Amino acid sequence: MPRLPFLASTCLGALALAAAPEPRFERRTITTDFFSEGCAVGDLNGDGRPDIVAGPHWYAGPEFRLRHTFAANPGRPYDPLGYSESFVQLVADLNGDGKPDVITVGFPGKETYWYENPGAPGTAPWKRHLFLASTDNESPHLVDLDGDGRPYLVCMSGGAVGYAKLNPLDPTQPAKFVPVSPAEPKKYQRFTHGLGVGDLNGDGIPDILERSGWWEHPAATAPLDTQWKFHPMAFSAGRNGGAQMIVTDVDGDGLPDVLTSLDAHRFGLSWFQQKRTPEGITFVEHRILDDKPENSAGGFALGQMHALVLSRQIVAGQPALVTGKRFWAHGPKGDVNPQATPLVLWLTWAKDAEGKVVFNPRVADTEAGIGTQFEVADLDGDGRAEIVVANKKGLHVLSSAR
Protein backbone atom coordinates (compact mmCIF):
# COMPACT_ATOMS: atom_id res chain seq x y z
CA MET A 1 0.00 0.00 0.00
CA PRO A 2 1.59 3.30 -1.02
CA ARG A 3 1.54 6.13 1.48
CA LEU A 4 -0.33 8.54 -0.79
CA PRO A 5 -3.71 6.74 -0.53
CA PHE A 6 -3.28 6.72 3.25
CA LEU A 7 -2.91 10.50 3.32
CA ALA A 8 -6.07 10.90 1.29
CA SER A 9 -7.82 8.44 3.58
CA THR A 10 -6.77 10.40 6.64
CA CYS A 11 -8.52 13.48 5.26
CA LEU A 12 -11.71 11.51 4.72
CA GLY A 13 -11.50 10.14 8.24
CA ALA A 14 -11.01 13.64 9.64
CA LEU A 15 -14.19 14.84 7.93
CA ALA A 16 -16.11 11.98 9.48
CA LEU A 17 -14.71 12.75 12.92
CA ALA A 18 -15.60 16.41 12.57
CA ALA A 19 -19.21 15.51 11.92
CA ALA A 20 -19.67 13.68 15.23
CA PRO A 21 -17.49 13.15 18.31
CA GLU A 22 -15.98 9.69 18.24
CA PRO A 23 -13.27 7.83 20.13
CA ARG A 24 -9.69 8.72 19.37
CA PHE A 25 -6.75 6.60 20.42
CA GLU A 26 -3.48 7.46 22.10
CA ARG A 27 -0.59 5.03 21.78
CA ARG A 28 1.48 3.94 24.74
CA THR A 29 4.49 1.77 23.99
CA ILE A 30 5.12 -0.77 26.74
CA THR A 31 8.28 -2.13 25.09
CA THR A 32 9.93 -2.10 21.69
CA ASP A 33 11.28 -5.62 22.28
CA PHE A 34 9.95 -8.27 19.90
CA PHE A 35 8.87 -11.36 21.83
CA SER A 36 5.51 -12.25 20.33
CA GLU A 37 3.04 -11.59 17.50
CA GLY A 38 0.07 -12.26 19.75
CA CYS A 39 -1.03 -11.12 23.20
CA ALA A 40 -3.70 -11.74 25.82
CA VAL A 41 -5.45 -9.90 28.64
CA GLY A 42 -6.50 -11.35 32.01
CA ASP A 43 -6.23 -10.81 35.75
CA LEU A 44 -3.25 -13.04 36.41
CA ASN A 45 -2.41 -11.86 39.93
CA GLY A 46 -5.97 -11.70 41.26
CA ASP A 47 -5.95 -8.02 42.16
CA GLY A 48 -9.05 -7.26 40.09
CA ARG A 49 -7.11 -5.40 37.42
CA PRO A 50 -6.41 -6.75 33.93
CA ASP A 51 -2.83 -7.68 33.11
CA ILE A 52 -1.22 -8.15 29.69
CA VAL A 53 0.54 -11.26 28.41
CA ALA A 54 3.02 -10.98 25.53
CA GLY A 55 5.56 -13.70 24.79
CA PRO A 56 7.21 -15.11 27.94
CA HIS A 57 6.20 -12.09 30.00
CA TRP A 58 3.19 -10.65 31.73
CA TYR A 59 2.80 -6.99 32.65
CA ALA A 60 0.92 -6.03 35.80
CA GLY A 61 -1.95 -3.63 35.35
CA PRO A 62 -2.99 -0.92 35.48
CA GLU A 63 0.39 0.69 34.74
CA PHE A 64 2.01 -2.27 32.92
CA ARG A 65 5.45 -1.09 34.01
CA LEU A 66 6.30 -4.16 36.09
CA ARG A 67 7.28 -7.07 33.84
CA HIS A 68 7.21 -10.65 35.11
CA THR A 69 8.67 -13.66 33.34
CA PHE A 70 6.45 -16.75 33.48
CA ALA A 71 8.08 -18.89 30.76
CA ALA A 72 11.51 -19.75 29.48
CA ASN A 73 12.61 -17.14 26.98
CA PRO A 74 15.47 -16.64 24.54
CA GLY A 75 17.18 -14.23 26.92
CA ARG A 76 16.95 -11.42 24.43
CA PRO A 77 14.29 -10.18 22.01
CA TYR A 78 13.80 -11.94 18.70
CA ASP A 79 15.18 -10.36 15.55
CA PRO A 80 12.33 -8.60 13.67
CA LEU A 81 13.82 -9.99 10.46
CA GLY A 82 12.79 -13.44 11.69
CA TYR A 83 10.00 -14.94 13.77
CA SER A 84 9.13 -15.55 17.39
CA GLU A 85 7.94 -18.75 19.04
CA SER A 86 4.68 -17.06 20.06
CA PHE A 87 2.03 -16.48 17.37
CA VAL A 88 -1.16 -16.53 19.46
CA GLN A 89 -1.65 -16.12 23.21
CA LEU A 90 -4.77 -16.87 25.21
CA VAL A 91 -5.86 -16.77 28.83
CA ALA A 92 -8.24 -19.28 30.47
CA ASP A 93 -8.54 -21.33 33.65
CA LEU A 94 -7.55 -24.74 32.33
CA ASN A 95 -7.27 -26.74 35.55
CA GLY A 96 -10.33 -25.40 37.37
CA ASP A 97 -8.46 -23.80 40.27
CA GLY A 98 -9.97 -20.38 39.67
CA LYS A 99 -6.76 -18.81 38.39
CA PRO A 100 -6.30 -17.85 34.74
CA ASP A 101 -3.57 -19.79 32.98
CA VAL A 102 -1.69 -18.78 29.83
CA ILE A 103 -1.76 -20.63 26.51
CA THR A 104 0.95 -19.95 23.94
CA VAL A 105 0.48 -21.18 20.39
CA GLY A 106 3.95 -21.35 18.91
CA PHE A 107 5.27 -21.08 15.39
CA PRO A 108 2.79 -22.71 12.96
CA GLY A 109 3.04 -26.48 12.99
CA LYS A 110 4.85 -26.58 16.32
CA GLU A 111 3.70 -27.12 19.89
CA THR A 112 1.06 -25.31 21.89
CA TYR A 113 1.85 -25.13 25.60
CA TRP A 114 -0.11 -23.94 28.59
CA TYR A 115 1.45 -22.42 31.67
CA GLU A 116 -0.07 -23.09 35.07
CA ASN A 117 -0.69 -19.97 37.14
CA PRO A 118 0.82 -20.55 40.60
CA GLY A 119 -1.25 -17.80 42.18
CA ALA A 120 1.43 -16.53 44.54
CA PRO A 121 3.85 -14.01 43.05
CA GLY A 122 7.38 -15.23 42.46
CA THR A 123 10.26 -15.31 40.03
CA ALA A 124 10.24 -19.01 39.15
CA PRO A 125 8.88 -20.03 35.74
CA TRP A 126 5.34 -21.37 35.77
CA LYS A 127 4.83 -25.09 35.22
CA ARG A 128 4.63 -25.78 31.50
CA HIS A 129 2.29 -28.43 30.09
CA LEU A 130 1.95 -29.62 26.50
CA PHE A 131 -1.50 -28.77 25.12
CA LEU A 132 -1.09 -29.99 21.54
CA ALA A 133 2.03 -31.34 19.84
CA SER A 134 1.34 -29.78 16.44
CA THR A 135 -0.97 -26.81 15.90
CA ASP A 136 -1.60 -25.87 12.28
CA ASN A 137 -3.37 -22.80 10.84
CA GLU A 138 -2.23 -19.33 11.88
CA SER A 139 -5.50 -18.24 13.57
CA PRO A 140 -6.56 -20.86 16.14
CA HIS A 141 -9.46 -20.06 18.47
CA LEU A 142 -10.15 -20.95 22.10
CA VAL A 143 -13.91 -21.48 22.49
CA ASP A 144 -16.47 -23.64 24.28
CA LEU A 145 -17.93 -25.86 21.56
CA ASP A 146 -20.37 -27.87 23.66
CA GLY A 147 -21.51 -25.51 26.42
CA ASP A 148 -19.78 -27.31 29.28
CA GLY A 149 -17.78 -24.23 30.21
CA ARG A 150 -14.43 -25.71 29.22
CA PRO A 151 -12.46 -24.35 26.26
CA TYR A 152 -11.50 -26.15 23.09
CA LEU A 153 -8.56 -25.16 20.91
CA VAL A 154 -10.02 -25.02 17.39
CA CYS A 155 -7.25 -25.40 14.84
CA MET A 156 -5.87 -27.79 12.26
CA SER A 157 -3.52 -30.67 12.93
CA GLY A 158 -2.41 -33.75 11.06
CA GLY A 159 -3.85 -32.38 7.84
CA ALA A 160 -7.40 -32.01 9.22
CA VAL A 161 -9.73 -29.36 10.65
CA GLY A 162 -10.70 -30.07 14.24
CA TYR A 163 -10.30 -29.24 17.89
CA ALA A 164 -8.33 -30.23 20.97
CA LYS A 165 -9.75 -30.36 24.48
CA LEU A 166 -7.87 -31.13 27.66
CA ASN A 167 -9.08 -33.95 29.89
CA PRO A 168 -10.79 -32.24 32.85
CA LEU A 169 -9.70 -35.12 35.12
CA ASP A 170 -6.04 -34.45 34.31
CA PRO A 171 -5.51 -31.29 32.24
CA THR A 172 -1.75 -31.61 32.63
CA GLN A 173 -1.80 -34.37 30.01
CA PRO A 174 -1.72 -33.41 26.30
CA ALA A 175 -5.09 -32.92 24.65
CA LYS A 176 -6.45 -35.31 22.08
CA PHE A 177 -7.02 -33.76 18.67
CA VAL A 178 -10.45 -34.62 17.27
CA PRO A 179 -10.72 -34.11 13.49
CA VAL A 180 -14.04 -32.92 12.10
CA SER A 181 -12.87 -33.27 8.49
CA PRO A 182 -11.05 -35.91 6.46
CA ALA A 183 -7.28 -35.52 6.42
CA GLU A 184 -6.09 -33.45 3.45
CA PRO A 185 -2.46 -32.59 4.29
CA LYS A 186 -1.90 -30.44 1.21
CA LYS A 187 -5.01 -28.37 1.90
CA TYR A 188 -4.79 -28.10 5.68
CA GLN A 189 -1.12 -27.54 6.44
CA ARG A 190 0.81 -25.57 9.04
CA PHE A 191 0.65 -22.21 7.26
CA THR A 192 -3.05 -22.37 6.31
CA HIS A 193 -4.85 -19.04 6.68
CA GLY A 194 -8.41 -18.32 7.73
CA LEU A 195 -10.36 -19.93 10.58
CA GLY A 196 -13.49 -19.05 12.51
CA VAL A 197 -16.11 -20.38 14.92
CA GLY A 198 -19.78 -19.41 15.06
CA ASP A 199 -23.34 -20.65 14.71
CA LEU A 200 -24.10 -20.21 11.01
CA ASN A 201 -27.26 -22.29 10.73
CA GLY A 202 -29.03 -21.07 13.86
CA ASP A 203 -29.22 -24.40 15.68
CA GLY A 204 -27.52 -23.00 18.77
CA ILE A 205 -24.31 -24.98 18.26
CA PRO A 206 -21.06 -23.39 16.98
CA ASP A 207 -19.82 -24.41 13.54
CA ILE A 208 -16.25 -24.12 12.21
CA LEU A 209 -15.40 -21.92 9.22
CA GLU A 210 -12.36 -22.00 6.99
CA ARG A 211 -11.47 -20.30 3.74
CA SER A 212 -13.13 -22.89 1.49
CA GLY A 213 -16.37 -23.39 3.42
CA TRP A 214 -17.84 -24.32 6.77
CA TRP A 215 -18.22 -27.49 8.81
CA GLU A 216 -21.61 -28.02 10.41
CA HIS A 217 -21.50 -29.12 14.04
CA PRO A 218 -23.60 -32.29 14.44
CA ALA A 219 -26.18 -32.66 17.18
CA ALA A 220 -24.83 -32.62 20.70
CA THR A 221 -25.88 -36.26 21.10
CA ALA A 222 -23.74 -37.41 18.15
CA PRO A 223 -20.72 -39.61 18.94
CA LEU A 224 -17.44 -37.75 19.45
CA ASP A 225 -15.89 -39.17 16.28
CA THR A 226 -18.79 -38.10 14.03
CA GLN A 227 -17.48 -36.31 10.95
CA TRP A 228 -19.02 -32.89 10.50
CA LYS A 229 -20.92 -32.00 7.33
CA PHE A 230 -19.02 -29.74 4.93
CA HIS A 231 -20.70 -26.85 3.12
CA PRO A 232 -18.44 -25.45 0.38
CA MET A 233 -18.17 -21.67 0.16
CA ALA A 234 -15.29 -19.66 -1.28
CA PHE A 235 -14.65 -17.19 1.53
CA SER A 236 -11.33 -16.25 -0.12
CA ALA A 237 -11.94 -16.88 -3.82
CA GLY A 238 -8.70 -16.58 -5.78
CA ARG A 239 -6.79 -15.61 -2.64
CA ASN A 240 -4.94 -17.42 0.10
CA GLY A 241 -7.17 -16.99 3.11
CA GLY A 242 -7.21 -14.40 5.85
CA ALA A 243 -7.12 -14.60 9.61
CA GLN A 244 -9.80 -14.81 12.31
CA MET A 245 -13.18 -15.25 10.57
CA ILE A 246 -15.96 -13.52 12.48
CA VAL A 247 -19.61 -14.60 12.58
CA THR A 248 -22.06 -11.77 13.28
CA ASP A 249 -25.32 -10.37 11.90
CA VAL A 250 -24.03 -7.47 9.81
CA ASP A 251 -27.25 -6.36 8.09
CA GLY A 252 -29.68 -6.90 10.96
CA ASP A 253 -31.85 -9.50 9.23
CA GLY A 254 -31.42 -12.07 11.97
CA LEU A 255 -29.11 -14.29 9.94
CA PRO A 256 -25.43 -14.72 10.85
CA ASP A 257 -23.03 -13.26 8.29
CA VAL A 258 -19.25 -13.57 8.00
CA LEU A 259 -16.56 -10.88 8.24
CA THR A 260 -13.13 -11.90 7.01
CA SER A 261 -9.95 -10.69 5.41
CA LEU A 262 -9.30 -12.44 2.11
CA ASP A 263 -5.53 -12.73 2.11
CA ALA A 264 -3.42 -12.23 5.21
CA HIS A 265 -0.40 -11.26 3.12
CA ARG A 266 -2.03 -9.23 0.39
CA PHE A 267 -5.32 -7.34 0.22
CA GLY A 268 -9.02 -7.75 0.71
CA LEU A 269 -11.68 -7.45 3.43
CA SER A 270 -15.27 -8.56 2.81
CA TRP A 271 -18.50 -9.36 4.52
CA PHE A 272 -20.49 -12.34 3.32
CA GLN A 273 -24.25 -11.86 3.55
CA GLN A 274 -26.13 -15.01 4.44
CA LYS A 275 -29.12 -15.96 2.31
CA ARG A 276 -31.57 -18.79 2.87
CA THR A 277 -32.95 -20.71 -0.12
CA PRO A 278 -34.85 -23.99 -0.48
CA GLU A 279 -31.48 -25.55 -1.29
CA GLY A 280 -29.92 -24.31 1.94
CA ILE A 281 -27.57 -21.56 3.10
CA THR A 282 -25.68 -19.42 0.60
CA PHE A 283 -23.57 -16.28 0.92
CA VAL A 284 -23.19 -13.12 -1.17
CA GLU A 285 -19.84 -11.32 -0.94
CA HIS A 286 -19.63 -7.55 -0.39
CA ARG A 287 -16.13 -6.07 -0.60
CA ILE A 288 -15.16 -3.55 2.09
CA LEU A 289 -11.44 -2.92 1.43
CA ASP A 290 -9.27 -3.90 -1.51
CA ASP A 291 -5.95 -3.10 -3.19
CA LYS A 292 -7.08 0.22 -4.70
CA PRO A 293 -8.39 3.24 -2.78
CA GLU A 294 -11.25 3.73 -5.23
CA ASN A 295 -12.50 0.22 -4.44
CA SER A 296 -12.17 0.57 -0.67
CA ALA A 297 -14.35 2.15 2.00
CA GLY A 298 -12.84 5.47 3.04
CA GLY A 299 -10.11 5.08 0.43
CA PHE A 300 -8.06 2.71 2.60
CA ALA A 301 -6.05 0.25 0.50
CA LEU A 302 -4.89 -1.73 3.52
CA GLY A 303 -2.80 -4.87 3.13
CA GLN A 304 -1.68 -7.74 5.39
CA MET A 305 -4.81 -7.85 7.59
CA HIS A 306 -3.50 -10.83 9.55
CA ALA A 307 -5.75 -10.41 12.59
CA LEU A 308 -9.32 -9.23 13.25
CA VAL A 309 -11.34 -8.61 16.42
CA LEU A 310 -15.01 -7.68 16.79
CA SER A 311 -15.70 -5.44 19.80
CA ARG A 312 -18.75 -3.71 21.28
CA GLN A 313 -16.68 -1.50 23.59
CA ILE A 314 -15.18 0.88 21.02
CA VAL A 315 -18.55 2.56 20.43
CA ALA A 316 -21.15 1.86 23.11
CA GLY A 317 -23.84 -0.51 21.93
CA GLN A 318 -22.46 -0.73 18.41
CA PRO A 319 -20.17 -3.42 17.00
CA ALA A 320 -16.83 -2.35 15.59
CA LEU A 321 -14.36 -4.41 13.60
CA VAL A 322 -10.72 -3.80 14.49
CA THR A 323 -7.89 -4.81 12.16
CA GLY A 324 -4.68 -3.43 10.72
CA LYS A 325 -1.52 -4.11 8.79
CA ARG A 326 0.75 -6.79 10.14
CA PHE A 327 4.18 -5.24 10.39
CA TRP A 328 6.94 -7.05 8.49
CA ALA A 329 5.06 -10.33 8.22
CA HIS A 330 7.84 -11.62 5.97
CA GLY A 331 10.44 -8.98 6.70
CA PRO A 332 11.12 -5.60 5.09
CA LYS A 333 11.10 -7.00 1.55
CA GLY A 334 8.37 -9.63 1.72
CA ASP A 335 4.69 -9.46 0.79
CA VAL A 336 3.14 -6.48 -0.98
CA ASN A 337 4.29 -3.02 0.15
CA PRO A 338 6.02 -4.24 3.33
CA GLN A 339 7.08 -0.70 4.25
CA ALA A 340 3.58 0.77 4.01
CA THR A 341 2.17 2.65 6.98
CA PRO A 342 1.41 0.12 9.77
CA LEU A 343 -2.15 1.24 10.35
CA VAL A 344 -4.58 0.04 12.96
CA LEU A 345 -8.17 0.62 11.81
CA TRP A 346 -11.58 0.31 13.39
CA LEU A 347 -14.71 0.08 11.27
CA THR A 348 -18.38 0.54 12.06
CA TRP A 349 -21.26 0.10 9.65
CA ALA A 350 -24.83 1.22 9.06
CA LYS A 351 -27.45 1.13 6.32
CA ASP A 352 -27.80 4.06 3.94
CA ALA A 353 -31.08 5.47 2.58
CA GLU A 354 -31.31 2.64 0.06
CA GLY A 355 -30.77 -0.03 2.71
CA LYS A 356 -27.21 -0.83 1.65
CA VAL A 357 -24.70 -1.65 4.38
CA VAL A 358 -21.94 0.98 4.33
CA PHE A 359 -18.70 0.59 6.30
CA ASN A 360 -16.91 3.57 7.85
CA PRO A 361 -13.22 2.93 8.66
CA ARG A 362 -11.24 5.21 10.98
CA VAL A 363 -7.59 5.26 11.98
CA ALA A 364 -6.77 4.21 15.53
CA ASP A 365 -3.00 4.42 15.04
CA THR A 366 -0.39 4.92 12.33
CA GLU A 367 2.68 3.35 13.98
CA ALA A 368 1.80 0.22 15.95
CA GLY A 369 0.47 -2.11 13.27
CA ILE A 370 -0.71 -5.56 14.29
CA GLY A 371 0.67 -9.08 14.53
CA THR A 372 -1.10 -12.40 14.04
CA GLN A 373 -3.52 -11.90 16.94
CA PHE A 374 -4.38 -9.06 19.33
CA GLU A 375 -6.83 -8.10 22.07
CA VAL A 376 -9.50 -5.44 22.54
CA ALA A 377 -10.45 -5.01 26.20
CA ASP A 378 -11.27 -2.38 28.82
CA LEU A 379 -8.03 -2.19 30.79
CA ASP A 380 -8.86 0.69 33.12
CA GLY A 381 -12.54 0.16 33.91
CA ASP A 382 -13.80 3.31 32.20
CA GLY A 383 -16.17 1.39 29.93
CA ARG A 384 -14.09 2.09 26.83
CA ALA A 385 -11.90 -0.44 25.12
CA GLU A 386 -8.17 -0.38 24.65
CA ILE A 387 -6.50 -2.11 21.72
CA VAL A 388 -3.48 -4.19 22.76
CA VAL A 389 -1.09 -5.25 20.00
CA ALA A 390 2.15 -7.26 20.05
CA ASN A 391 4.33 -7.65 16.99
CA LYS A 392 7.79 -6.98 15.61
CA LYS A 393 7.49 -3.35 16.74
CA GLY A 394 7.02 -4.42 20.36
CA LEU A 395 3.99 -4.19 22.66
CA HIS A 396 1.58 -1.26 22.48
CA VAL A 397 -1.64 -0.16 24.15
CA LEU A 398 -3.97 2.12 22.19
CA SER A 399 -6.19 3.86 24.74
CA SER A 400 -9.47 5.40 23.69
CA ALA A 401 -10.45 8.90 24.74
CA ARG A 402 -13.23 11.34 23.87
Language-model features: locations:
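Beta-propeller-forming repeat regions
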Residues: 18-402
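Hydrophobic h-region of N-terminal signal peptides that target proteins for export
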Residues: 10-20
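Bacterial N-terminal signal peptides that target proteins for export
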Residues: 1-11
